[in-house]
Amino acid sequence: MTYFVLFLSLCFVLGGLAVASNPSPYYGVVGLVLASVVGCGWLLSLGVSFVSLVLFMVYLGGMLVVFVYSVALAADPFPEAWGDWRVVGYGVSFVGVLVMGLVIGGFIGCLNFGVVTVDSVGMFSVRLDFSGVAMFYSCGVGMFLVAGWGLLLTLFVVLELVRGLSRGAIRAV
């Protein structure tokens, strides 16, 4: 199980790198789908089944609509591929930043790795994902407002990610 979680975390990082160093909006969609599927599988392996399902539906339902909109506005006649030197340079620099962050975090001592599942306390504990559903309906107004602002911010981030070096998705239509 530990190797499976490590494999999922490696795939999640690779999906994030694919989104961050996308040469074209078409490839950014592939990285987003990979990162969302692997991230939800990671949560599912840790016992958070409901939150995993909700995030999977939000990511593939909402974010793919944003990417389709962005691809329609910022379509390139000749999209770059993964093998271009600029894209490889972006990927290598992102991996370098990630490795340096892990090294510095290891020296400072702020990295504590461990896997704890949701229902590892015992029989009398309440699963956290089911109590999260109750929080949606009891005092979740502020949480919904924060989530809405986060999704709006994510929309603008994705629109800027797909624009490339030329005029992109945020322009006068």
UniProtKB/Swiss-Prot annotation:
Enzyme Commission (EC) number: 7.1.1.2
Subcellular location: Mitochondrion membrane
Main function: Core subunit of the mitochondrial membrane respiratory chain NADH dehydrogenase (Complex I) that is believed to belong to the minimal assembly required for catalysis. Complex I functions in the transfer of electrons from NADH to the respiratory chain. The immediate electron acceptor for the enzyme is believed to be ubiquinone.
Enzyme class (EC, first level): translocase
Keyword Coiled coil: no
Top-rank lineage group of the source organism: Eukaryota
InterPro entries: ComplexI_Subunit6, NADH_UbQ/plastoQ_OxRdtase_su6, Nuo/plastoQ_OxRdtase_6_NuoJ
Molecular functions per Gene Ontology: NADH dehydrogenase (ubiquinone) activity
Record membrane topology: Multi-pass membrane protein
Gene: MT-ND6
Transmembrane segments: 1-21, 27-47, 48-68, 91-111, 139-159
GO terms for cellular component: mitochondrial membrane
Keyword Translocase: yes
Primary site of residence: mitochondrion
Organism: Fratercula cirrhata
Similarity-based family: Belongs to the complex I subunit 6 family.
Keyword vocabulary terms for this entry: Electron transport, Membrane, Mitochondrion, NAD, Respiratory chain, Translocase, Transmembrane, Transmembrane helix, Transport, Ubiquinone
Name recorded for this polypeptide: NADH-ubiquinone oxidoreductase chain 6
Pfam families linked: Oxidored_q3
Reactions it catalyzes: a ubiquinone + NADH + 5 H(+)(in) = a ubiquinol + NAD(+) + 4 H(+)(out)
